[in-house]
């Protein structure tokens, strides 16, 4: 297994098998009615949610509020015991913090007339139903195909509910949907558990999925029943991209405006329900990536789609470097009969002039469009281009216009936790949901007949859902973040979210390596960070500053990161000294790239080498000599 969590769950499974607590699935029979017409059903599970001691509906297994997945192991709830924080947030996208326990209760009634939902509140007064999802999981086989029918209802049958339902790693099926008192809402969708590769965040490597997840959140929300069928294969919509595309795992309390979430996550709300969406994106990637690409290449099949969206992290090679990597994606799709969708990157919100947000990444849009057009001209019929870049910019400016020209209005779709500055690159859950809808609109607007036909199986069957805008109840409280953001402070002695562990220079005196540690801290890591190295001469006079070209990424979670590209106009010479600090960055795109944000938010303590006068010559893995200053931090 890849980590201790998996070992823990395996141990719990062994115990459950000995005690006989596991309920095995019913083998499908000729009388089994498939959830989706035409499916061949191999196995089936039916769960009825209610209080202990009540009777389950005929043919269903009773799930009670104390059915804990970790101890029951075959199925049950996540996040319901003191040790839940050790599970992390990679199973269903939600993660308990130390000291948090989700409290569940049944609503009353028998059979399918009962339900289970989150109740109570945490020590900061955050309501359980709103901020602590009811998180159900079924042990499942990776690489297998599942259909799900979930029925939600109101926990208190005398009151209305506002419910959001998620699957897998916080993929929305529907959000903020009103369910009237005592009524139900049933939805059917598809899930393909798939290992996910993590290159930038820890623990690293290929991490098993192994679950079908169904979670609900929202005022008075509850799960009434879930039916799951393991079936033969069906189409999959694969997603590759960077931090603006990847799944955005979060820590509780859950609030849609305080978590990084990529556009790929939001797609599940609109994709045809007979497609499963698998997001293999990760923060910090660009189109040259191979690890995540190979995860898809080794699994994609005829009839599948591959969505590829890159651009933000091509800071050193630009659109030319981006487009030079696209052939491998097309060849992988073409060889198996799948369809490639090249998607231009979402825009940033950091360039506001003349009353409107401006393009910073349109060079990638132009390059991607030309690449696809050239392929089509050469005879390709299994590729399409979708201009999300322009549609995202139009969305930002519409929000601004609709709010009287207020440029801060769109920040509600990018602002995350309090205290770390406004992120200008990464959408939150609300932003991802709306930007995914812009993809839907852009895909429907494709006019080239070849590309339009390639997209037709998806575009002609989009689910009829629309995005939810941030409510005026939130925006009326002031600029983001405001008092609507839930209060929750994790005790920590760390002042800064980033620690610089090492800085290295090559023989020419050029900075070429930095190692940093991202950690929980009193200051929130709210946006990209930029390493700034200040060089002084032997008299203590400043010679200039060296700036990292690559960001310290705030979207990949805690752990170490390595930065290898820096500006070279200032060099460290014999007798010089230096210090380094991580500041909040502004990502300008184009030739400008990262700069220090005017807000001047400091993300690290000042890094001071132990010996500012002497250096040691090292060789890196390629045999290049380096100046290696050791830190005393």
Language-model segment annotations:
Residues 19-35:
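Sec-dependent signal peptide cleavage junction
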Residues 49, 223-281, 294-302:
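Serine-esterase "nucleophile elbow" of acetyl-processing enzymes
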Residues 77-140:
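Surface-exposed, low-complexity/disordered Ser/Thr/Gly/Pro/Asn-rich loops and linkers
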Residues 156-175:
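Short, surface-exposed beta-strand/strand-loop-strand elements in extracellular ectodomains
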Residues 214-221:
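Short beta-strand-plus-loop segments that form exposed binding edges in beta-rich domains
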Residues 236-241, 245-246, 276-281, 304-310, ...:
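Structural recognition of the beta-strand scaffold that forms the well-ordered cores
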Residues 289-324, 334, 347-350:
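Oxyanion-hole/transition-state-stabilizing segment in secreted/luminal serine hydrolases
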Residues 350-481:
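Catalytic His-Asp segment of secreted/periplasmic serine-dependent ester chemistry enzymes
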């Amino acid at each position: 297994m890849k980590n201790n969590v998996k070992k823990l769950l395996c141990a719990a499974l062994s115990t459950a098998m000995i005690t006989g607590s596991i309920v095995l699935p019913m083998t499908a029979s000729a009388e089994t009615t498939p959830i989706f017409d035409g499916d061949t059903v191999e196995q089936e599970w039916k769960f009825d949610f209610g209080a202990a001691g009540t009777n389950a509906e005929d043919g269903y297994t009773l799930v009670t509020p104390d059915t804990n997945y970790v101890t029951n192991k075959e199925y049950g709830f996540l996040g319901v015991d003191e040790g839940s924080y050790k599970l992390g947030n990679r199973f269903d996208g939600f993660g308990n913090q130390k000291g948090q326990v989700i409290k569940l209760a049944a609503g009353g009634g028998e059979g399918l007339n009962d339900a289970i939902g989150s109740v109570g509140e945490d020590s900061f007064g955050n309501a359980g139903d709103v901020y602590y999802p009811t998180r159900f999981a079924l042990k499942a086989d990776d690489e297998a195909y599942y259909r799900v029918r979930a029925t939600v209802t109101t926990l208190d049958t005398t009151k209305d509910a506002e419910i959001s339902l998620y699957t897998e790693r916080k993929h929305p099926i529907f959000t903020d949907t009103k369910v009237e008192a005592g009524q139900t809402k049933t939805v059917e969708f598809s899930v393909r558990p798939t290992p996910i590769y993590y290159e930038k965040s820890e623990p690293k490597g290929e991490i098993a999925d192994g679950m079908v997840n169904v979670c609900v959140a929202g005022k008075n929300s509850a799960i009434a029943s879930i039916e799951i069928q393991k079936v033969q294969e069906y189409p999959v919509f694969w997603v590759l991209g960077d931090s603006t595309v990847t799944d955005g795992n979060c820590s509780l309390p859950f609030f849609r405006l305080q978590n990084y979430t990529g556009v790929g996550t939001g797609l599940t709300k609109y994709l045809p329900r007979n497609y499963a969406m698998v997001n293999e994106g990760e923060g910090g990637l660009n189109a040259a990536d191979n690890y995540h690409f190979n995860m898809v290449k080794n699994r994609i099949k005829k009839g599948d789609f591959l969505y590829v969206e890159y651009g933000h992290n091509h800071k050193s090679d630009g659109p030319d470097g981006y487009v030079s990597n696209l052939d491998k994606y097309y060849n992988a799709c073409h060889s198996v009969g799948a369809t490639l969708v090249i998607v231009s990157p979402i825009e940033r919100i950091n360039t506001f002039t003349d009353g409107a947000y401006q393009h910073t990444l349109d060079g990638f849009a132009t390059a991607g469009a030309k690449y696809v057009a050239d392929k089509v001209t050469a005879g390709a019929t299994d590729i399409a281009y979708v201009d999300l870049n322009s549609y995202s910019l139009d969305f930002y400016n519409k929000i601004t216009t609709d709010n009287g020209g207020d440029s801060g209005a769109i920040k509600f779709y990018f602002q995350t936790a309090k205290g770390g500055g406004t992120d200008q690159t990464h959408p939150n859950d609300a932003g991802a949901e709306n930007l995914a809808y812009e993809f839907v609109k852009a895909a429907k607007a494709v006019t080239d007949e070849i590309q339009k036909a390639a997209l037709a199986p998806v575009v002609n069957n989009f689910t009829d859902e629309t995005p939810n805008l941030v409510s005026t109840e939130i925006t009326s409280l002031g600029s983001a973040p405001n008092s609507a953001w839930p209060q929750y402070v994790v005790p920590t002695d760390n002042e800064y979210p980033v620690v610089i562990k090492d800085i290295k220079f090559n023989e020419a005196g050029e900075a070429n390596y930095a190692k940093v540690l991202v950690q929980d801290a009193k200051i929130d890591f709210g946006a990209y960070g930029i390493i700034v190295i200040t060089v002084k001469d032997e008299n203590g006079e400043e010679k200039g500053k060296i700036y990292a070209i690559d960001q310290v990424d705030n979207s990949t979670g805690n752990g170490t990161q390595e930065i290898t590209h820096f500006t070279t106009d200032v060099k460290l010479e014999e007798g010089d000294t230096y210090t380094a600090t991580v500041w909040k960055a502004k990502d300008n795109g184009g030739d400008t790239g990262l700069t220090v944000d005017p807000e001047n938010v400091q993300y690290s303590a000042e890094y001071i080498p132990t010996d500012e006068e002497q250096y040691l010559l090292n060789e890196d893995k390629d045999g290049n000599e380096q100046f290696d200053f050791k830190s005393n931090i």
